[in-house]
Amino acid sequence: MERIATVILSQNNGKGADLVFLCEVENISVLERLRQEYLQAAAYRPAILLEGPDERGIDCAFLTRLPLDGSPALHPITLSKVNDPSKVVERTTRAIFQADFKLPGGERLSALAIHFPAGFHPIEHRKEALSRLKEVAQDAAKKSQIVLAAGDFNINFKEAPELYNNIAARDWQITHLEGCKECEGTYYYAKDEHWSFLDAIMVFKGGIPAAHHRWKMDPDSIRIVNENVIQKKKTGFPLKFMIDKDGEPRGVSDHFPVWMQLKAEAL
């Protein structure tokens, strides 16, 4: 937990992001321990998490300084049946976790935290997840000035041209397509010797016309958070958390986080 907190507090002058999207959280008690014992400097409000249908018992969650605007909700993703007996897939996947917040000035932001079906699922399952995400975003955009989706999309470099560029980009601004042009990725596949942007932040293009609200994605702010030495191997690749042979902790996560800021423009 201390290492996770170190990475979070390394941003925004030691305060961490105003809104943090988290994946693979065990339960609300663990997240509250992280907030209260290790993230006091961030002054986050009580953690936000709803237990979902994941078979492994992991969920998406939020830490934020923004006030809630309504009750959080889970939106299930229905996956089509896999008829190939050689494919071992999960029967359920993580739901889309929605929480709505008040921005400075009173505008409403809808945040959709996601953790899409893993790579061993067929690509159709990630397509279905993208379709469901669009439905949820369209509904959220009826009341919110801006809708964000962020988390682990599990879209690797082989699927990215179809899923990110051809499908998602029609409805969303995607961090690594809008900015971060020199960024390599958030996850490294050692077997393929290739980076992937499994993780991203997306801003919905639909809903209330952008001309009618002042909050926009700032492409120049987009970057991969990987400057902390504890996050990386000597090669620069992500180093997942482990206890080494000497009993010492090493690493933080096998994914690097993504950072993005919204900018307020005059109407």
Enumerate the predicted regions with their spans.
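Metal-dependent phosphoester-hydrolase catalytic domains
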Residues: D139-V147, I155-L267
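Catalytic metal-binding/acid-base residues of hydrolase active sites
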Residues: V25-E26, H115-P117, F153-N156
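A long, amphipathic alpha-helix that forms part
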Residues: P122-S144
